UniProtKB/Swiss-Prot annotation:
Protein name, entry field: UPF0301 protein Nmul_A2478
Any single Pfam family the record assigns to this protein: DUF179
Lineage top rank: taxon: Bacteria
Family statement drawn from the similarity comment of this UniProt entry: Belongs to the UPF0301 (AlgH) family.
Entry GO CC: cytosol
Length: 186
């Protein structure tokens, strides 16, 4: 049973996390309900740029930004599917509003807009997503697999991927290197 809504929160993988998909990750939760949770890993770039992705989709772009804009590994589910996390929410064919400021879009129209220089003000593009069955995320939290903190869009959209985990930890006032692999409940 869902006890807290983690939508628009970060999940910070604890040092003891051994799952190779999630070790040392920062995951942004886009949706959390009694039906489960959906999130995107926001600190693990893959060897693909936005220009590469647009080329694969036969969407032409001469925008220099797309040549150096990294694509993130969003999670191990549907690795062939693209997800665009963006500010503002805007109006796209297939958008889920995470909150009043952040949207998650899966339709090609947003990629075409990006290629034409008409993209949302802030964006992160990922392949794949992270998903949890009903009650799974709560179970993992009870086993101390994750720390949670309300998300900061500035961390997602304004910092390089390699700085995001540390910045999220600072929101909690915690240094990642000081965390123990051995944790328990009082």
């Amino acid at each position: 049973m869902q006890s807290v809504d983690l939508t628009h929160h970060f999940l910070i993988a604890m040092p003891a996390m051994t799952d190779p998909f999630f070790a040392k990750t920062l995951t942004y939760i886009c949706e959390h309900s009694d039906q489960g949770a959906l999130g995107l890993v926001v600190n693990r770039p893959i060897d693909l740029t936005l220009k590469d992705l647009l080329d694969q989709l036969d969407i032409s772009s001469d925008d220099q930004l797309t040549r150096r804009f990294p694509i993130m590994f969003g999670g191990p589910i549907q690795l062939d599917r693209g997800f665009v996390l963006h500010q503002p929410v805007g109006e796209w064919q297939s958008t889920m509003a995470v909150n009043d400021d952040v949207g998650l879009t899966t339709s090609l129209d947003i990629l075409r807009a990006i290629a034409n220089g008409e993209s949302p003000r802030q964006l992160l593009v990922a392949l794949g997503y992270s998903g949890w069955a009903p009650g799974q995320i709560e179970h993992e939290l009870s086993r101390n697999a994750w720390l949670t903190v309300p998300a900061s869009p500035a961390i997602i959209f304004e910092l390089p991927a390699e700085e995001r985990l540390t910045a999220a930890m600072r929101l909690l006032g915690v240094d990642f290197s000081s965390l123990s692999d051995e944790v328990g409940h009082a």
